[in-house]
């Protein structure tokens, strides 16, 4: 019985320790424009892109400020290195079409940090969202 208790305790300690070891974070910042005007109050979300039946983990969300600027940071615990991505939901040059344009940018793994706070931020720079991105889609859920 004591052998089983030792093995169980060791398993629990390993499980608790693995959470701290594999906590990872990412951060992204940038400026969104619509032509020559800042794209203010635009929804931006930072996800860990998971494959398979596992849903993507929302790490952070926010909106751009009056100058079109945003900064997001988030963290999660995973066994493997996280795959951060930025989703932008906007109506720049969209006319009267329903829902919003959704554009996704994958963040390089070199910007993933261990721990809850990112050591570096991925700076996407200034992007004119008038561009029609090849991979963009429409989204009616994330206003």
From Swiss-Prot:
Q: How changing residue 27 to E affects the protein?
A: In gt1983; increased sensitivity to the neurotoxin 6-hydroxydopamine (6-OHDA) during the first three larval stages resulting in the degeneration of dopaminergic head neurons
Q: State its location(s).
A: Secreted
Superkingdom is Eukaryota
Primary location group: secreted
Effect upon mutating residue 72 to F: In gk567379; increased sensitivity to the neurotoxin 6-hydroxydopamine (6-OHDA) during the first three larval stages resulting in the degeneration of dopaminergic head neurons
UniProt keyword terms in alphabetical order: Secreted, Signal
Q: Name one GO cellular component term.
A: cell surface
Secretion signal, residue range per the UniProt entry: 1-20
What Pfam families would the database entry show? TTR-52
Query: Could you say which tissues express the protein in this record?
Result: Expressed in head cells next to and anterior of the first pharyngeal bulb, the pharynx, and the hypodermis.
Can you tell me which residues the record assigns to a coiled coil? none
User: Is the Heme keyword given for this protein?
Assistant: no
Record bears the keyword Cell membrane:
no
Q: What is this protein's function per UniProt?
A: Protects dopaminergic neurons from degeneration caused by oxidative stress.
Q: Which family does it belong to?
A: Belongs to the nematode transthyretin-like family.
The protein's name: Transthyretin-like protein 33
């Amino acid at each position: 019985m004591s052998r089983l208790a030792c093995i169980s305790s060791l398993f629990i300690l390993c499980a608790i320790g693995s959470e701290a070891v594999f906590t990872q974070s990412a951060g992204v910042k940038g400026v969104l424009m619509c032509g020559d005007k800042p794209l203010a109050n635009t929804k931006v979300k930072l996800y860990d892109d998971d494959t398979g039946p596992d849903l993507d983990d929302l790490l952070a969300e926010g909106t751009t400020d009056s100058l079109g600027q945003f900064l997001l940071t988030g963290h999660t615990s995973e066994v493997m290195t996280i795959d951060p991505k930025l989703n932008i939901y906007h109506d720049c040059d969209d006319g009267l079409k329903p829902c919003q344009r959704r554009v996704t940018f994958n963040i390089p793994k070199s910007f993933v940090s261990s721990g809850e706070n990112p050591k570096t931020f991925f700076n996407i720079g200034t992007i004119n969202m008038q561009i029609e991105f090849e991979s963009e889609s429409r989204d009616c859920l994330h206003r």
